[in-house]
From Swiss-Prot:
The entry's DNA-binding region: 37-61, 89-112
Species in which this protein is naturally found: Zea mays
PROSITE patterns: HTH_MYB
Keyword Cell division: no
Keywords: DNA-binding, Nucleus, Repeat, Transcription, Transcription regulation
GO CC terms in record: nucleus
UniProt-recorded name of the protein: Myb-related protein P
Transmembrane region(s): none
Subcellular location: Nucleus
Amino acid sequence: MGRTPCCEKVGLKRGRWTAEEDQLLANYIAEHGEGSWRSLPKNAGLLRCGKSCRLRWINYLRADVKRGNISKEEEDIIIKLHATLGNRWSLIASHLPGRTDNEIKNYWNSHLSRQIHTYRRKYTAGPDDTAIAIDMSKLQSADRRRGGRTPGRPPKASASRTKQADADQPGGEAKGPAAAASSPRHSDVVNPGPNQPNSSSGSTGTAEEEGPSSEDASGPWVLEPIELGDLVWGEADSEMDALMPIGPGGTTRLPSKGLARSAARPRWTTCSTWTGMASRPICGAGRSRTSTARSCGRPPSRWKLLLLLLLRRRPAPRTIASWRRSRLGSCPTRSDGSGHRTDQTDQIIGSRVLARSLPSRGSWFRWPNNWEKNSTARAVKPPPCAPDVDACRVELLRI
């Protein structure tokens, strides 16, 4: 419902003020002060509402109210302040001593608003114009009362757009080594081929400098620390990246520290092995968790955790062999120097390329009885007298 306006009360006088009422109001305020405007009319003996008494006193009866017409200089100040502040008549009146906000508003609406366009064409800003100093403390205090934004503070949308524009600039300054080391979630693509030396200087490169041919020849190596219980995989705590198989019977040594960072995002090779492992339960681990294979980007975190659990557990060899035989039937094959036919697939475990060129049938894993954190993966070429193994077998051995 709200409070009933005081002017609607029965018996109150409305309309023009008489000289006797002005005298009663001026004498009471001179003796007792303004006080409460709601109780002032009754105490002063006036049949007026409190709002009418307040407006009459502030706009007409005060001693510091300036009488007479508004001068030409005051018009210039009003126009310039209105162009800066808008319809904030109280702030404009604070720069014109003796003039009330109501008087300035009425003068603007009745005279200046009609002549503003002619005035702007006639009076252009020149070097001899008098500058108007705006009291910023009053402006900020008025903003706090009205709930406006403090001057000088940009909106959130503009700030976010500015940050996005700075991030999208290709010619921006490169981040320092401290900033690069503060984000361990971002992986590095390391390709120690002839086109890119293994240097520890931390120099950056581009995708065009690396070339796609070297990556296809040796495969993508992605280094990213992973922690699961007491098993920690990383650049400093793991030796899993020490030996990287590149084919039947061959290994490549990778540096564990001081790897060159690349500006390109890590690219993951999608093959039938990845798709099969991502769409089927992992070696009968008890729970069927699946993830979607992607041709670009980083594999899901749950995919890494499941593969780490696969290393820690000891599944039956027949499960892996049967699963490998069923999932690798459509993989492309090649023939190496020894006459064995192997599959060009990548076995990715815990964001590491564990082994390549796994056989399509008859493959088996030999798991150690006691798993240690410091372990490595080796690709051992099978002897010629082993007809049941086509190309190689992966052994996890203790150091």
